[in-house]
Amino acid sequence: MEQNFARMIDHTLLKAEATKEQIEKLCAEAKQFNFASVCVNPTWVKHSSELLQGSDVLVCTVIGFPLGANTPAVKAFEVKDAIANGANEVDMVINIGALKDKNYDLVQADIAAVVQAAKGSALVKVIIESCLLTDEEKVKACELAVAAGADYVKTSTGFSTGGATAADIALMRKTVGPELGVKASGGVRSLEDMKSMVEAGATRIGASSGVAIMNGLIADSNY
């Protein structure tokens, strides 16, 4: 079971002040525990890719992060640049304001631009920033992600007012059905936290506390 859990974790370090030494430690830990991926900012993709060469650990990065307020063209360029640097997965933030405005065509086109840019090269996870949305908006965001051809929906950036909840994961899973992945991120700090997310329907976990989770310890990290 522990190995299965390890393969569900995106070992994450997205803090602005992350140093080269910290990224190298992240990658070493990911290799040690055989995590699914490391999730790093775009500036660290190339170095992480080099460090993880020959391992099963993928490189995941973030697009339009953390606000989601870039244009679709900029997000698409970010994806292509990330792939050129070695990214295997991209976690993009939706246009949250457009969703609130019920400008669903723009929200879907924005996701579709990223999906198109990643096609054949990288898996796409769509961050809906659930803490800022009503349940109705969460459902709509997930439906738009499905329509745009995304691979996953994801709760949170970890940089807003809240993180993943089991209730949100259950709602997202119910909305997207069994085919799409669902990623819980933000505030998953212990093995118990992770178990509750997986039981609710999560298939991937984004956490900076991956090592603590694997050791069954509660970390004092905020992400």
UniProtKB/Swiss-Prot annotation:
Compartment list: Cytoplasm
A Gene Ontology biological process noted in the UniProt record is:
carbohydrate catabolic process
GO MF term set: deoxyribose-phosphate aldolase activity
Q: Which CDD domains does the UniProt record give?
A: DeoC
Give the positions the UniProt entry annotates as the active site.
Answer: D91, K154, K183
Identify the keywords attached in UniProt to this record, alphabetized. Cytoplasm, Lyase, Schiff base
Name the pathway. Answer: Carbohydrate degradation; 2-deoxy-D-ribose 1-phosphate degradation; D-glyceraldehyde 3-phosphate and acetaldehyde from 2-deoxy-alpha-D-ribose 1-phosphate: step 2/2
E.C. no: 4.1.2.4
Q: What family is reported? A: Belongs to the DeoC/FbaB aldolase family. DeoC type 1 subfamily.
Summarizing the function annotation, the protein's role is:
Catalyzes a reversible aldol reaction between acetaldehyde and D-glyceraldehyde 3-phosphate to generate 2-deoxy-D-ribose 5-phosphate.
What is this protein's name?
A: Deoxyribose-phosphate aldolase
Source organism per entry reads Lysinibacillus sphaericus (strain C3-41)
Organism classification, top ranks? Answer: Bacteria, Bacillati, Bacillota, Bacilli, Bacillales
